[in-house]
Amino acid sequence: MDIGNPVIQLCLEGTRAEFEHKKEEARAFYQQAWEIHIDDYEACIAAHYLARLQKTAEDTLQWNLTALEHAFAVNDESVESFLPSLYLNLGHSYETLGNNAEAKKYYQLAAALGVIHQATNIPQSNFENQKS
């Protein structure tokens, strides 16, 4: 990740603001990152961070889907290490919205890349026994 990239710098500033409990300031940094993105890599990063501070679960899901869409449009390995996080966020979005089948799908995609997550609202027996 190129920390000299303006989109990444804005996302780092947004993260700093988040840790300082300044959510509106953080959201503004992430929104600015989205507005200045020039390629799919930058769009993926900005959308991922924008998803974190949405006011509704539906909006969070949409931004997470946008991030994944742009990740898939990147034609190199630059987002590969980022995919587990995108999958986990999508899993959590679907779980929050009560769509356990979709949640399980994305949690399993993350697990296939080495990141295991325990779903909070999906009974473990259902999670293990459902087929992909």
What role is predicted for each listed range?
Residues 8-25:
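Alpha-helical segment of the N-proximal tetratricopeptide repeat
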Residues 40-80:
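Alpha-helical adaptor scaffolds
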Residues 14, 48-51, 84, 91:
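Conserved small-residue packing positions in alpha-helical repeats and bundles
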Residues 10, 44-47, 87:
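TPR repeat positional signature
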Residues 1, 33-40, 71-80, 116-120:
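Flexible helix-coil transition and linker loops at the boundaries of alpha-helical arrays
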Residues 22, 56-59, 99:
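Residues in the short coil linking paired helices within alpha-helical repeat scaffolds
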